[in-house]
Amino acid sequence: MKYKHVFSICAYGDSPYLEACIRSLKEQTVPSHIILCTSTPSSYIDRLAWRYGIPVYVRHGESNIRDDWNFAYHMADGEFVTIAHQDDMYHRDYAASLLKARQSYGDMTVFTTDYVIVKKGRLITGDGMLWIKRLLRLPLRLHALSHLE
């Protein structure tokens, strides 16, 4: 693997959120390699990628989330790959936290975090779906449950 960690952005059409996603990845306290993958190429995507120095990879064929995300994963040449959807924004310490967790858990294959929703410029931290997802991830946080054989 060429890189320790790669952010692989999945972009579709001309999303108004794409640039905020890119900026959040570029502003990481620990830099990671960034690529952009799309099955819906456009001059808008190309301009943003050029502005931020990000290589673009185009998947040909019908656009669908399964094949697009698999393509994004396979184009990333990294030990760890984060599939970043175009409307995701990452905390500036995300990559640092990932690499720190890797040092603590040598057999780590999945890294999961909490998240918040940005709606109309406000952070939503406690809606029903967020609490359900937190509950479902709880066994991953408890060592006794996450290392069952």
Task: Report each predicted region and the residues it spans.
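Short aromatic/hydrophobic "clamp" motif used to bind/position activated sugar donors
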Residues: V81
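The conserved acidic donor/metal-binding loop of glycosyltransferases
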Residues: H85-M89, D114
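Short, flexible, basic/aromatic active-site loop/helix in glycosyltransferases
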Residues: M129-E149
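Short, acidic, metal-binding catalytic loop of nucleotide-sugar glycosyltransferases
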Residues: R23-S32
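Conserved donor NDP-sugar-binding/catalytic core segment of glycosyltransferases
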Residues: D93-M129
